[in-house]
Design a protein with these regions (language model features):
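Charged catalytic cores and adjacent phosphate/nucleic-acid-binding surfaces used
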Residues: 1, 13-16, 156, 161-162, ...
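An N-terminally biased module of ancient metal coordination in phosphate/nucleic-acid-related enzymes
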Residues: 1-98, 103, 175, 181, ...
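Divalent metal-binding pocket/active-site signature
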Residues: 10, 35, 96-98, 111, ...
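Short secondary-structure boundary/capping elements
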Residues: 68-71, 149, 214-218
Length: 259
């Protein structure tokens, strides 16, 4: 559950907590993207340089790089000091950029978050999930090459040992572009890496209800391979506002269970 569309206040956090409690959850994870925080602006330089669309998007200081990590930590401590109706864990979703691995580690080192989610949102600086992505990426480059590079970056993320979870492992499918080659060997390699590095794989419903992709979470093929390798799977509604908390989670939870 992301706080990015609201303030870093206890009152706003409680909207998410209360909605989750109403739906019967006993534990939730609350986080925000690193593009909210000033400390992480340096790792987005490649995204800015890659496209004028992206440079303009990241220049919106009302939404991007507007808060400090210390403000977020103060909020976390404030919420944790009070009794909440359910368990609340706090973390970050970090845009992983291989060339900034050391910088990311340096920024994170002073903090003790409950979890850290690593995510790949760009292919060497070109965002794959934005309205302009078709123009700058999908219509310009070979789909097979995009997929191969995406999973190379995912593998590097997992091997970095910086993260406890991997965000939306197959959201590269968002606009329903698919490679011509068989992804199963890639999925098996990813599953093995997740187990080896003790990283949870996320089954995220956001691609379904926010972007209208037919899969409610992970593709059946990827989910089956994760379960074959006994990957620790975590469900996520990717809620960016309180009313989206838990969307479709019940539908995917039963699919992700190990019976």
């Amino acid at each position: 559950m992301h706080l990015e569309n609201g303030p870093l206040t206890k009152e706003y956090v409680m909207q998410f907590i209360n909605e989750a409690y109403k739906q019967g959850f006993d534990r939730i994870q609350i986080l925000d993207h690193t593009h909210r925080f000033k400390e992480f602006e340096v790792i987005y330089q490649g995204v800015k340089d890659a496209s004028d669309y992206q440079k303009e998007w990241l220049a919106n200081k009302k939404m991007k790089f507007k808060d400090s990590l210390s403000s977020y930590v103060r909020l976390i401590n404030e919420v944790k000091s009070e009794k909440t109706p359910i368990e609340v864990l706090f973390g970050l979703e970090v845009c992983y950029v291989p060339e900034y691995k050391d910088e990311i580690e340096r920024i994170l080192e002073p903090y003790q978050f409950d979890f850290l989610v690593g995510a790949i949102h760009s292919i060497d600086g070109l965002l794959y999930d934005m309205p302009w992505s078709k123009e700058i990426l999908w219509d310009k480059y070979n789909v097979d090459d995009i997929y191969r590079r995406y999973y190379e970056l995912i593998f590097d993320l997992v091997k970095s040992n910086l993260f406890t979870q991997l965000a939306h492992p197959d959201t590269i499918k968002m606009f329903s572009y698919y490679p011509s080659y068989d992804l199963k060997p890639t999925y098996h390699e990813l599953a093995q890496l997740l187990v080896e590095h003790h990283v949870k794989g996320e089954c995220n419903t956001g691609c379904y209800y926010r972007y209208h992709h037919p899969d409610k979470g992970l593709s059946k093929e990827l989910l089956d391979i994760f379960k074959e390798h006994h990957v620790d799977i975590i469900t996520a509604s990717d809620a960016h506002k309180p009313e989206d908390v838990g969307t479709c989670i019940k539908d995917i939870y039963k699919l992700c269970r190990y019976d």
